[in-house]
């Protein structure tokens, strides 16, 4: 319903600002200047609302990170990696929800590390390096673990690398993989 969409959007914004732990009927109602009753009328439990926020967060990440169709890049894998890290840096609470919270098990995972459609990137990478799709998929998995590790460290404020440093890591990684 339109009302439940409003509550989901507000819960998503609370999550972006404060983390999923801050999502409760009282906080959603306070932001919308209403009582908690309409919030709870639309969701059987707060857990149901949080699950809806997770789904919304996953769709949001897909729009921000997945290699846009038609976008041309000389280094598609590098670009996606940098976009992934940029997403983690700009949306740390959404990143934590998706990958580090008790809800992370809901994140669709496949043999590429996460259930996102990176096939266009893999195909471009295979063509760029003149390797098979299978080899490109294997390279993607190795890169995913490196990029995801950097993103996790940045999100948890263990390190903060500049964009230039991150690009240099990617360039060196690429040089070492050939």
Whereabouts are the PLM-identified features?
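Amphipathic alpha-helical linker/stalk segments
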Residues: 51-79, 119-123
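Alpha-helical DNA-contacting segments of helix-turn-helix folds
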Residues: 15, 48-57, 98, 106, ...
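Amphipathic C-terminal alpha-helical segment
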Residues: 97, 144-162, 175-178
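Amphipathic alpha-helical packing segments from all-alpha helical-bundle domains
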Residues: 66, 99, 104-130, 137-141, ...
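Helical hydrophobic small-molecule/effector-binding pocket
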Residues: 77-100, 107-112
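Helix-turn-helix
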Residues: 14-48, 52
């Amino acid at each position: 319903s339109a009302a439940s969409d409003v509550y989901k959007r507000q819960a998503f914004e609370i999550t972006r600002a404060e983390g999923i732990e801050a999502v409760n009927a009282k906080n959603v109602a306070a932001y919308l200047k209403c009582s908690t009753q309409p919030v709870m009328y639309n969701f059987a439990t707060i857990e149901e609302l949080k699950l809806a926020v997770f789904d919304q967060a996953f769709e949001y990440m897909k729009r921000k990170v997945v290699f846009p169709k038609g976008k041309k890049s000389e280094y598609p894998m590098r670009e996606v990696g940098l976009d992934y890290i940029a997403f983690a840096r700009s949306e740390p609470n959404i990143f934590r929800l998706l990958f580090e919270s008790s809800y992370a098990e809901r994140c669709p995972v496949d043999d590429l590390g996460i259930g996102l459609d990176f096939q266009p990137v893999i195909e471009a990478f295979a063509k760029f390096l003149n390797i098979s799709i299978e080899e490109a998929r294997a390279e993607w998995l190795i890169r995913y673990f490196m990029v995801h590790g950097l993103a996790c460290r940045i999100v948890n404020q263990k390190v903060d690398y500049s964009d230039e440093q991150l690009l240099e890591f990617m360039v060196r990684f690429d040089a070492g993989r050939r």
